[in-house]
Amino acid sequence: MGSEMCIRDRFMSKVEKIAQKYVPAVVSFVFVPTITIFFANVALFTVFGPVGNMIGNGLAAVIDVLYNSFGAFGAFVFAALLQPLVVTGTHQAIQGIEANLIATTGFNYIQGIWSVSIIAQGGGAIGMYLLAKKHSKDRDIAMSSFIPTLVGISEPAIFAANLKYSVIPFVCSCLGAGCGGAFMKLAGVRAIGQGLTGILGLLIVVPNKLVFYVIGNLIAFIVPIVLIVIYNKTKGCLLYTSPS
């Protein structure tokens, strides 16, 4: 249902703008929300529901093929592309796939992939922190955006640090996620639940895979830092602010 809701929310914003344009201001408080919700729900069940279901099924099939047929390489690609899905909002469809995995097999291999993809963005933020020696504001932002990644929230790191001046830190983070994801696949890391990543993910990872889970996340964290520092030294400065 995640992909359907994602599509519906974007449609609702368009309908609301149109309704605000044509509905008289004196009754807009009542009728704009009513019109928006009505047309959005009609579209959800007649158009976006079936389309979103197809997208979700297609995404599930791609993930299954990548992870189970292409081994560590497939896991690398999956992990590397997961946060770009977050940027577009289509990542919500994966939650249903995780629930189905737990229901049918009792385990969730996507949890480890989720974790490394988020932790890698935190690594990217730390990489930017290290570069911002003369930019106190950027250092503060980078550090504060890194902390949420430890408990599974990547958006601050993505938008406040890794995409702020260049796409390079974000790409480096995605590559770090891929490395961590490949390790998770090789180590056979699995969880018995969903929704918890980073430090909190330790609560649901299969006990005999905890050490590998930690190692995979460390790989995902360290690789972006190294790549960002190397890129900055060889290709030029990634920061474009005046010292503060």
Which ranges hold each PLM region?
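Short aromatic-rich membrane-water interface segments that cap or initiate transmembrane helices
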Residues: 63-70, 107, 205-209
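Transmembrane helix-loop junctions in multipass membrane proteins, especially transporters and channels
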Residues: 17, 25, 45-53, 87-91, ...
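Transmembrane alpha-helical segments and their short flanking loops
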Residues: 72, 100, 135-136, 144, ...
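Core mid-bundle transmembrane helix pairs that form the ion/substrate translocation pathway
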Residues: 16-86
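Transmembrane alpha-helix interface/packing and boundary motifs in multi-pass membrane proteins
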Residues: 79-91, 105, 148-151, 184
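Helix-loop-helix junctions within the multi-pass membrane cores of secondary transporters/permeases
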Residues: 95, 99-173
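Conserved small/polar residues in nucleotide/adenosyl-binding loops
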Residues: 2-7, 240-244
